[in-house]
Amino acid sequence: MSHDLSQLRKFVSPEIIFGAGCRHSVANYVKTFGARKVLLVSDPGVLAAGWVADIQASLEGQGIDYCLYTDVSPNPRVDEVMLGAEFYRSEGCNVIVAVGGGSPMDCAKGIGIVAAHGRSILEFEGVDRLRVPSPPLILIPTTAGTSADVSQFVIISNQDERMKFSVVSKAVVPDVSLIDPETTLTMDPFLSACTGIDALVHAIEAFVSTGHGPLTDPHALEAMRLIDGNLVQMIANPGDIALREKIMLGSMQAGLAFSNAILGAVHAMSHSLGGYLDLPHGLCNAALVEHVVAFNYSAAPERFKVIAETFGIDCRGLTQGQVRQRLVDHLIAFKHAVGFHESLALHGVGSSDIPFLSRHAMQDPCILTNPRESSQRDVEVVYGEPL
């Protein structure tokens, strides 16, 4: 009997604890790894918001030694990863805990890679290049969108080259994720919009990815339903913990989908754009999403129709072209409703930047699972549309 190996699908995820207040149990999970000393990774904003103090209190309450590393930029950098790994080694740590958004969590993943391998993080760009297990890793997200807390991705900025690069490996999936919607209560409207759009794009791209399958589709669809149906309300009612929980759950579902199905051209192009101009990742996604959807539609019309129906669009009696336009219009209206109106030109992107951006986008692993095969010229055209 012959089997089509291209149809096989894997699914990796951390141990997930979801619910308000679960962050306070972090010490219980740290103890299961025989922690000698914990490297606690965060950033100045999360530290000021008070969430780090909760983690410190949990560790101190059970007599667990730790040291704190907060030298993390909004887009974590190579030097920050390398300095963090040196700090990890010099302090004699053997467990890593990160509390924060995607930046501290990605930095923590990078620190674990370098600590385990003893080499520069730059050497691990690409897919499945890790050969040594990382130290035990516990992640506590304080934003609802990046899904670094459940994914097998690490995104790091190389400032020398003005680009972001990806490390993709199941070795960077955290051991434990404590997903506590209370930690998102300090997010401002812009950050809520950025991370929410990111999560929505994760779900859309995972559903139409060439790596999609029955293990990821339910997560992607539920993520789209939760985020599309609740993000605008949540931004308008930032203290509503029930809405926060729905968006946090949507982010988690989107993360489980894209971590296993991978992504597409929106993220390949966003990584290039964000690395070049150091822009917020969600803002880049918002600028590009409807243009990439319009470009990709012909390659997966039935799956895009399911997305449209998930957003509540009545597709009965519509042609493919009409469904495509309704979906694009919905995405534009949605991003406007959460506060994204500006063109890329207002953020410093010019037509002369497009060849550079496109070359790097074509080298991103996410482009490999885009539903429509793309040339550099295709990517250049799409980059030009939101200017």
Protein language model annotation of sequence segments:
Residues 351-387:
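Short, amphipathic C-terminal "tail helix"
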Residues 57, 153-261:
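Carboxylate- and glycine-rich phosphate/diphosphate-binding segment that chelates Mg2+/Mn2+
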Residues 79-182:
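Glycine/threonine-rich beta-strand-loop-alpha-helix active-site module
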Residues 145, 252-285, 364-368:
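Glycine-rich phosphate/pyrophosphate-binding beta-alpha loops
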Residues 276-353:
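Gly/Pro-rich interdomain helix-loop hinge
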Residues 47-119, 233-244:
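N-terminal small/polar loop signature for handling phosphorylated ligands or for N-terminal nucleophile
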Residues 1-33:
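N-terminal amphipathic/basic leader segments beginning at the initiator methionine
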Residues 23-39, 57-62, 90:
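Glycine-rich phosphate/diphosphate-binding loops that line cofactor/substrate pockets in enzymes
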